[in-house]
Amino acid sequence: MDNRHLALYPFVTEASEYVGSLGFSPDKLLSSRALESARIRGRERVIQALEGEIEKPSPSSSEEGKILTELLSYPFSRILVSCIDDPFLTRKYALAEAKAAYHLLKTQQPEFLQDLATDFRINAEIYENPETHDIFFDLHFTDYIKLASPLKDLNWKLVNRKMKKGYVKISKEELARLLQEAIRLRIQNSLPVTVPKEICEACIPHTDTISEELEKKKTEFGVGEFQRVESDLFPPCITQAIANVRAGVNLAHSMRFAMTSFLINIGMSVDEVVAMFNISPDFDEEKTRYQIEHIAGTSSGTTYKPPSCNTMRTYGNCSAPDELCKGVKHPLGYYSRRVWVKNRMQNDNEKGHEEKKEGETPPQ
């Protein structure tokens, strides 16, 4: 790749080697006045990741300064994400970087996608239909399963694909989508990197800005750290699902996923969730544990969130909504709000109790 493409795809091995050859240590990357634009861009791409989309510039091959800024902003953004070391941020960042690459890959020539796939140790053979001249790729089914398994659309299921002699035929855009998944996994699994404490301290002006945006986004998504699981504060849909499980009702797959991912996200352990399904009529502990560990990200590092309220309604899983349901968009948002209200009331009561004690007449 030329330097312009390395800047657009900074996660490839060649880009890492090129940056290493420039001799920019983390300390120099942080302190050099000449690299201020790279630091600003590095912070910007993390904030853009929180918003869901990293905007990639398109510098010409002659704009060496802009190319270097974009190229060096990537390792600096990784430093910032690592210093904050928040799983939610790491997942959002990796996904946004991968999505940005996907949009670019769709415009590239087939040979470029083939070369990029090779960097991920994926053998994608180019095939041209002799009659229509359409371009396809042949991908070994093991590579296909590895990359397509997290994708939810039924079209990605192996049983719905054409396979010949162990190879799956896919379109150029489909290969770009699978490469997006490979990119996401590479970035997510490589974070956090080890960053010296003094470097993280020097990054505080940048990480504070990102952390502020991170907390806003967590509130929006209903993501937070819960001190303990409070079942009396669950949204009606989850309460009903748990009641059905305890009554021996076999939940639909979509509701089972929603309930499991909700419980994992509020802090229940895999063992605790497995125990809840122990009464289910089709209970298979090994299979159940595998499914729950997958949702919890035990092996992949990706913890799945429960579906939004709109999706719950679409699948018929929204049951007995109450007044609070009208003001939230996500089951985790419902739970977060009720936890916040309960904590606020407890704090107010404790404060009032202290004030009352101070105003009491001491015994005579």
Swiss-Prot record:
Q: How is the cofactor bound?
A: Binds 1 [4Fe-4S] cluster.
Entry annotated with the keyword Lipid metabolism: no
Region (Disordered) residue ranges read 345-364
Check the record and name the InterPro entries matching this protein. Answer: DNA_primase_lsu_euk/arc, DNA_primase_lsu_PriL
* An annotated Gene Ontology molecular function: DNA-directed RNA polymerase activity
Q: Which cofactor does it need?
A: [4Fe-4S] cluster
* One GO cellular component, as annotated: primosome complex
Checking Pfam families in the record gives: DNA_primase_lrg (PF04104)
Arranged from A to Z, the UniProt key words for this protein are: 4Fe-4S, DNA replication, Iron, Iron-sulfur, Metal-binding, Primosome
* GO biological process: one example: DNA replication initiation
Q: Which NCBIfam families match?
A: PRK02249.1-2 (NF002588)
Function, in words: Regulatory subunit of DNA primase, an RNA polymerase that catalyzes the synthesis of short RNA molecules used as primers for DNA polymerase during DNA replication. Stabilizes and modulates the activity of the small subunit, increasing the rate of DNA synthesis, and conferring RNA synthesis capability. The DNA polymerase activity may enable DNA primase to also catalyze primer extension after primer synthesis. May also play a role in DNA repair.
Q: How does it assemble?
A: Heterodimer of a small subunit (PriS) and a large subunit (PriL).
Q: What is this protein called?
A: DNA primase large subunit PriL
